Amino acid sequence: MQRAKEVMKVSDGSLLGEPGRTPLSKKEGVKWQRPRLTRQALMRCCLVKWILSSAAPQGSYSSDSELELSAVRHQPEGLDQLQAQTKFTKKELQSLYRGFKNECPTGLVDEDTFKLIYSQFFPQGDATTYAHFLFNAFDADGNGAIRFEDFVVGLSILLRGTVHEKLKWAFNLYDINKDGYITKEEMLAIMKSIYDMMGRHTYPILREDAPLEHVERFFQKMDRNQDGVVTIDEFLETCQKDENIMSSMQLFENVI
């Protein structure tokens, strides 16, 4: 419950902010700067917490503020290549891999594991549907399993990628059937799944019609040719022109 409250203090539960609303820093006359993800922020990521809790040696104390773990013996093949592909350090990759292998000895994560992770971090709500959508976004080839390489590449984009990279990833998440377009039904399904995951014990209390209102506002702004769908170009252009959406990219860490 506490985690949901922390999330809701800075977000309405969406992966993108409210379109057209001026950020607080802008109102105060302060120039907005894209937030830099700190190690502390990285440690708030559910998937990272899950991995590192398993990476820590048995009986040892693991601090939330410390990502690098000592005595890492596991190492994935092509570590240097992964370091080049991501924005994680070598020690971070080693730590993530150790936990990954401890939790998933086969080297693959399945959808049930994702659902278990999110049910643990969001016990006050129903995280099943959101975990399903998130898993499919990580499962690039659609084979029902996620390799470590795909896992950390996705995490790198979400946690340390550029705004453009995060927006492309968000589009892929919303594009549930992967046809290259986002429909109102698809965006509404994602929004509802996030609100369901947050549960009814959040602050401020969420209205049941909030997801639909959110989607209607976004489509009014994004669907420029009024054809009922949003393309990747419409999505990127609209989001990057909206300062509130840009600043809200940091909120990915709250539901990943």
From Swiss-Prot:
Per its UniProt entry, which superkingdom is the organism in? Eukaryota
The entry marks the following residues as binding Ca(2+) 1, namely 175, 177, 179, 181, 186
InterPro entries per record: EF-hand-dom_pair, EF_Hand_1_Ca_BS, EF_hand_dom, Recoverin
* A Pfam family recorded for this sequence: EF-hand_7
List residues, modification Phosphoserine.
14, 60, 63
Span of domain EF-hand: 67-123, 126-161, 162-197, 210-245
Q: Which cysteines are joined by disulfide bonds?
A: none
Q: What is its main location?
A: cytoplasm
Q: Where is the lipid attached (S-palmitoyl cysteine)?
A: 45-46
- Glycyl lysine isopeptide (Lys-Gly) (interchain with G-Cter in SUMO1) cross-link located where? 26, 90
Task: List the subcellular locations.
Answer: Cytoplasm; Cell membrane; Endoplasmic reticulum; Golgi apparatus
Q: How does it sit in the bilayer?
A: Lipid-anchor
Q: How is it modified post-translationally?
A: Palmitoylated. Palmitoylation enhances association with the plasma membrane.
> Quaternary structure?
Binds to DNA as a homomultimer. Dimerization is induced by binding to calcium. Interacts with the C-terminus of PSEN1 and PSEN2 and with PSEN2 CTF subunit. Associates with KCN1. Component of heteromultimeric potassium channels. Identified in potassium channel complexes containing KCND1, KCND2, KCND3, KCNIP1, KCNIP2, KCNIP3, KCNIP4, DPP6 and DPP10. Interacts with KCND2 and KCND3.
Q: What protein family does this chain belong to?
A: Belongs to the recoverin family.
Task: Summarize the protein's role.
Answer: Regulatory subunit of Kv4/D (Shal)-type voltage-gated rapidly inactivating A-type potassium channels, such as KCND2/Kv4.2 and KCND3/Kv4.3. Modulates channel expression at the cell membrane, gating characteristics, inactivation kinetics and rate of recovery from inactivation in a calcium-dependent and isoform-specific manner.
Specify the protein name. Answer: Calsenilin
Organism from which the protein derives: Bos taurus
The opening ranks of the lineage are: Eukaryota, Metazoa, Chordata, Craniata, Vertebrata
